[in-house]
């Protein structure tokens, strides 16, 4: 039977830690029997890694792929707990710890190409071996290096229009006007926008789709140290409104959704940056009877400050809603 029964890391459940904040927790070590000369410690680790395959240059063999990758170390701190008289009796022992997160950290992130992760790991060792360890991952929200106060106070709008053909010889047009009171938000905040749709065709418009996209540009290097970049997009949020706009009519749809509580901030310049992120709200009207769509795109800026995070909505609010006017 192992001398160590269990080792646990105790932290507030589902906590989101801002860069620059303090992590307070406990390590709980439970022993089956007396342990002599133990080492009990806890580590805070944050690192990022990206990797993808791409074809090598024009003059070379396209049948071969090259691996592009990059990594960054953001934080690595260790606390070793003092052990009185260098032994621990059987039973449970609790060790308190706290770590200060560095003020400049990227947010927790995960995709098929890259990840940025943070974790606290507790370890119990004797003179030669690791007897037990436990790792607990953290949610960390990065802080913006810049503030977008002027942008956040300005309304933004975009308009799209398309001429369409239907029923062989009929023609018309559909216009879409999307307006937001601002385009700068913090994670967890509610995003509200208005879509005005004008249907100058003889057909019904049934649905309108709203989606928030994250566009990420990764930076890596080949084995020969050549710099490479890779762009990728992912859909963070999606909702659909049953507009049902009659022929030659118009309507206004007011929509809202809550942003995720942890998001990469819109890219500024930062050391050890292995990826840059931008965001876009896309409103799409599907016109299946003409095999076409009308799309409006609005850039969204994500910032994060201590003041902004204190004011944003929490999980108990509705994630999204929409209604017609």
Curated annotation (Swiss-Prot):
This protein's UniProt keywords: Differentiation, Membrane, Spermatogenesis
Q: Which InterPro entries match?
A: Arrestin-like_C (IPR014752), Arrestin-like_N (IPR011021), Arrestin_C-like (IPR011022), Arrestin_domain-protein (IPR050357), Ig_E-set (IPR014756)
Expressed, tissue-wise, as follows: Testis-specific.
The UniProt entry's GO biological process terms, in alphabetical order, are:
cell differentiation; spermatogenesis
Consequence of gene loss (knockout): Knockout of Arrdc5 in mice leads to male specific sterility. Male deficient mice exhibit oligoasthenoteratospermia, impaired acrosome reaction, impaired sperm penetration of zona pellucida, and defective spermiogenesis. However, Arrdc5-deficient sperm could fertilize eggs through intracytoplasmic sperm injection.
**Signal peptide location:** none
GO cellular component entries: membrane
> Gene3D superfamilies, alphabetically?
2.60.40.640
Q: Which SUPFAM superfamilies match?
A: E set domains (SSF81296)
- Annotated compartments: Membrane
Pfam families per the UniProt record, alphabetical: Arrestin_C, Arrestin_N
Free-text function comment from the UniProt entry: Plays an essential role in spermatogenesis. May be involved in the anchoring of the sperm head to the tail during spermatogenesis by affecting SEC22A-mediated SUN5 and NDC1 transport and localization.
Mind telling me what this protein is named?
Answer: Arrestin domain-containing protein 5
Q: Which organism is it from?
A: Mus musculus (Mouse)
Provide the organism lineage as a comma list: Eukaryota, Metazoa, Chordata, Craniata, Vertebrata
């Amino acid at each position: 039977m192992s001398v160590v029964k269990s080792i646990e890391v105790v932290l507030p459940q589902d906590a989101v830690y801002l860069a620059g904040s303090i992590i307070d927790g406990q390590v709980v070590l439970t022993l089956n029997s007396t342990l002599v000369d133990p080492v009990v410690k806890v580590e805070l680790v944050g690192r990022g890694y990206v990797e993808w395959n791409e074809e090598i240059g024009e003059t070379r063999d396209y049948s071969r792929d090259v691996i592009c990758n990059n990594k960054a170390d953001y934080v690595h701190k260790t606390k070793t707990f003092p052990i009185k008289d260098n032994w621990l009796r059987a039973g449970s022992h609790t060790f308190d710890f706290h770590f200060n997160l560095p003020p400049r950290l990227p947010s927790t992130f995960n995709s098929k190409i890259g990840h940025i992760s943070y974790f606290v790991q507790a370890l119990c060792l004797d003179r030669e071996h690791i007897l037990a360890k436990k790792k607990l991952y953290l949610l960390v929200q990065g802080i913006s290096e810049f503030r977008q106060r002027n942008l956040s106070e300005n309304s933004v709008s975009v308009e799209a229009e398309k001429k369409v053909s239907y029923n062989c010889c009929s023609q018309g047009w559909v216009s879409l006007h999307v307006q937001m009171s601002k385009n700068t938000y913090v994670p967890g905040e509610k995003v509200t926008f208005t879509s005005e749709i004008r249907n100058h065709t003889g057909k019904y418009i049934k649905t309108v789709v709203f989606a928030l996209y994250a566009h990420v540009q990764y930076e890596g290097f080949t084995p020969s140290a050549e710099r490479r970049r890779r762009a990728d997009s992912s859909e963070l949020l999606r909702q659909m409104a049953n507009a049902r706009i009659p022929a030659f009519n118009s309507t206004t749809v007011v929509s809202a959704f809550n942003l995720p509580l942890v998001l990469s901030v819109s890219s500024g310049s930062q050391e050890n940056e292995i990826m840059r992120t931008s965001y876009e709200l896309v409103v799409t009207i599907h016109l299946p009877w003409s095999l076409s769509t009308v799309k409006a795109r609005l850039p969204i800026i994500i910032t994060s400050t201590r003041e902004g995070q204190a004011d944003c909505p929490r999980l108990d609010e509705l994630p999204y809603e929409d209604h017609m006017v």
